[in-house]
Amino acid sequence: DAVADHDHIVAVIKGTFVNNDGSRKAGFAAPSVFGQEECMRSVLAVSEVGEDEVGYYEAHGTATELGDAIEARMLKNVYGSRPLKIGSVKSNIGHTNMAAGVANVIKTALMLENRTFVPTINHSEPADELKTPGCAITVCTKTEEWKSDSQRIAVCGAVGMGGANAMAVLGEYVEDIQRGEEEAKPYLFIYSGASKEAAKKISEDVAAYVTENDVRFDDAAYTL
């Protein structure tokens, strides 16, 4: 529907999954490695995405000694020695409480659209679980190009009080450039100016541009 409506597509939601730690957590407010790992493996399965296809994980990342250690252990269990960038928007904007998961999704979608890793600020040292030999999970600490030979894919994670885990797999939107022939019909070009003279100048500039360049009139009419 978004493609048909010519909407601006930032990223594609490939799948989501929600579960609860149940009795496997240490306490009501404490997360669980088992629950988070189950959620991660399940969201990858429903999204039909392999662990080696994921390039980034947006962590719940509350910067607590217990929570970060559990999340790091979950990532190590699932991704092993596979390269993976991780980060948390909480370092940039703080904890947005009920909107924390949405903030993760917005940040990650923009990263996919711009094909860029952005830094998690004020990070100095990774969790002990990520320091083990062979672990290739690293925290993003600087802005850098997200290089990939295939579709860029990321996972967003969020944890709720009482043992709730929620994850979403987001994919880069790859536009289908195969298009049909331009329909031979009149197209409406809409523009305005602060005066008649300004409007006339814009009209002349547009006419000159479409004459001198290979322009599809349907595209031009849609964006003007």
Residue map of PLM features:
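Condensing-enzyme catalytic core of the thiolase-fold
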Residues: 1-183, 188, 197, 212, ...
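Short hydrophobic/aromatic beta-strand micro-patches
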Residues: 192
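Hydrophobic side chains in well-ordered alpha-helices
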Residues: 199-202
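Short, low-complexity connector segments at domain boundaries
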Residues: 204-224
